[in-house]
Amino acid sequence: MRFGLNIDHIVTLREIRKTYEPEILEALFIAKNTHKVDLITIHLREDRRHIQNEDVLKLLEISPLPINIECSINAEITDFLCSLKNKPSKVTIVPENRNEVTTEGGLDCSLKGLGEVIRAYHNKGIEVSLFIDPLKDALHFAREHQVKQVEFHTGVYANLHNALYSNANNQIHAISVLKDKSPKELKEELHNAFLQLRRMSKEAFFMGITACAGHGLNYTNVKELLKIPSLRELNIGHSVVSKAVLVGLEKAILEMAQLIKR
């Protein structure tokens, strides 16, 4: 299983104070020196709430690890990434809503202009991945547009797992719709969410598409996904950075790597 480390929220700390620390390149090399991280993931959002254009340029120039850039189909961002001298190893196209706290679901593959943006990246020799819900129609769209990799949105699975097996339902930001469900209901929905991820990962494999996954994954809920043999990559960020605040980034990375690289 490949481990993609999302370092957006290291930059969030910097941007909260509009200062120079923490330094994104220091985080990059801490990750690299663990020898456990396979790629670095960043999300270049339209509102630039964390990652900035300058961060993209620095990482692509210096990084010894592959860089996966998440972004919307915004024309300005597409033009910027297509114009780069140093290319990312892949671009993952994600949905984006400026009012969201974090990405809320998979891409709507009927989105106007999506096919054109995919072609623009392909024409520049940049691999494209699509951040999608684990649905067959989305996989067929990927295949029709010569997309060789997808990332399944694991938010539904992760939230259900957290509600059932952690203290999430007793916290200030508990998800109200899950808080009102019984343990039996949560277990059934979690089982179905896992089965759907497993089915669609297998479907992707038979379609010649590499299946990755990410969103809301943490040190508790990630373990079950290791039972899906056709899942090749996990992208994880917030939980690692959250633990890093308490134990340090190197230790946080190593603890996660120990779980997913058995």
Swiss-Prot record:
Pathway(s) this gene product operates in, as recorded in its UniProt entry: Cofactor biosynthesis; pyridoxine 5'-phosphate biosynthesis; pyridoxine 5'-phosphate from D-erythrose 4-phosphate: step 5/5
Residues annotated as catalytic: H43 (proton acceptor), E70 (proton acceptor), H215 (proton donor)
One record GO biological process: pyridoxine biosynthetic process
Subcellular location, record wording: Cytoplasm
Binding positions for 3-amino-2-oxopropyl phosphate per the UniProt entry: N6, R17, G216, G237, H238
This protein's GO CC annotations: cytosol
GO molecular function terms listed in the Swiss-Prot or TrEMBL record: pyridoxine 5'-phosphate synthase activity
Catalysed reactions, semicolon-separated: 3-amino-2-oxopropyl phosphate + 1-deoxy-D-xylulose 5-phosphate = pyridoxine 5'-phosphate + phosphate + 2 H2O + H(+)
Chain sites annotated for binding 1-deoxy-D-xylulose 5-phosphate: D8, H9, R45, H50, T102
Recorded superkingdom: Bacteria
Site feature: Transition state stabilizer: E151
Entry function: Catalyzes the complicated ring closure reaction between the two acyclic compounds 1-deoxy-D-xylulose-5-phosphate (DXP) and 3-amino-2-oxopropyl phosphate (1-amino-acetone-3-phosphate or AAP) to form pyridoxine 5'-phosphate (PNP) and inorganic phosphate.
Subunit note: Homooctamer; tetramer of dimers.
Listed name of the protein: Pyridoxine 5'-phosphate synthase
